[in-house]
Amino acid sequence: MDRHKTLAIAESCTGGLLTHRLTNISGSSQFLEAAVVAYSNKAKQKLLNIPSRILRQHGAVSKHTAAAMAQSIREIHKTDFGIGITGIAGPTGATKTKPVGLVYIALSVPAKSEARLRRGSPKAARRWRPAETLCLQCRFKGTRTHIKRQASTQALRLLKKCLSY
């Protein structure tokens, strides 16, 4: 990751696996600012300020919740990027509309116009900036462990793809 970019992560169904994989990289403290495992709805509200309205209307496993997690963790820690992951790793917890393996991965990134403005000002780089949020809906198969691994891998791919632009 570009040494001038920072990242904060909000995980739910992956239980910290994405953070674990990133912290296995020597020098990850240069870009990883913070990580939170907000497994319950109460934790999502308390640690990430996710509005109860989003959780009531869309549920903990939704693109809306994943996006709110990514945006919130980014805003709270004033980082360049924020990742939010929520889903159903199984084997229990599924419904007809939300099966085991359904995972939402959101990436909150600096808005393009803001990114250009920040380049010349180190002070501006540490302020909160407006963002765009990308969200993937994924359907993974396998055991709980496999689903968590696939979700963390997909989050890394999404971040890498975003950084390559």
Predicted regions mapped to residue ranges:
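Short Gly/Ser/Thr- and charged-rich N-terminal loops/segments
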Residues: 113-127, 131
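Short alpha-helical segments enriched in small residues
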Residues: 1-113, 130-165
